[in-house]
Amino acid sequence: MSRVGKRPVAIASGVTANVEGQTVKVKGPKGTRSFTVHDDVSVELKDNVIRVAPRFETKRAQSLYGTARAQIANLVEGVTKGFEKKLEITGVGYRAALQGKNLQLSLGYSHDVVYPVPEGITITVPKPTEITVAGIDSQRVGQVAAEIRGYRPPEPYKGKGVKYANEFIFRKEGKKK
């Protein structure tokens, strides 16, 4: 069994946190976020440290309190540092461009894919073959990066497509004559 929930979440300097019932609100230099913890989990704030504990000794409460602790830690990290995912585009003629509030992707289709940038997420295109997705919400940053990757996932023969910067593409050998 994982013991993630037993570790307290330290509040960094420049970050204010308050707990009202089951809701944890965190405010930092990058923004404000809140998270509502499940009823089976108790949360307390004392001396700039948030502690999470299960209310009952049930299997459900045990599993939920580790998750709640990790999500609260992500709140604190998000408002201090933020989260970032880098995507790489590989393939002849495959490129990305930012046009206003939309990300335009040329991925080998007969049309360009236009992806509207959601609120709270910033997308930058340092090069036509690189995309950076950033924000204060870890889940939303990952979801947006996964949606962009989903338009043309990397294929195993030539490796063409959109992939994460640290992703390894398992390559296959082509047909032999």
Curated annotation (Swiss-Prot):
Residue ranges the record marks as coiled coil: none
Similarity annotation: Belongs to the universal ribosomal protein uL6 family.
One Pfam short name: Ribosomal_L6
GO cellular component: cytosolic large ribosomal subunit
Gene3D superfamilies: Ribosomal protein L6, alpha-beta domain
Phylogenetic placement of the source organism: Bacteria, Pseudomonadati, Pseudomonadota, Alphaproteobacteria, Hyphomicrobiales
Entry keyword set: Ribonucleoprotein, Ribosomal protein, RNA-binding, rRNA-binding
InterPro entries (alphabetical): Ribosomal_uL6-like (IPR000702), Ribosomal_uL6-like_a/b-dom_sf (IPR036789), Ribosomal_uL6_a/b-dom (IPR020040), Ribosomal_uL6_bac-type (IPR019906), Ribosomal_uL6_CS (IPR002358)
Protein name: Large ribosomal subunit protein uL6
Subunit-structure text: Part of the 50S ribosomal subunit.
GO molecular function terms listed in the Swiss-Prot or TrEMBL record: rRNA binding; structural constituent of ribosome
RNA-binding keyword on record: yes
Function comment: This protein binds to the 23S rRNA, and is important in its secondary structure. It is located near the subunit interface in the base of the L7/L12 stalk, and near the tRNA binding site of the peptidyltransferase center.
Source species of the chain: Afipia carboxidovorans (strain ATCC 49405 / DSM 1227 / KCTC 32145 / OM5) (Oligotropha carboxidovorans)
BP-aspect Gene Ontology terms: cytoplasmic translation
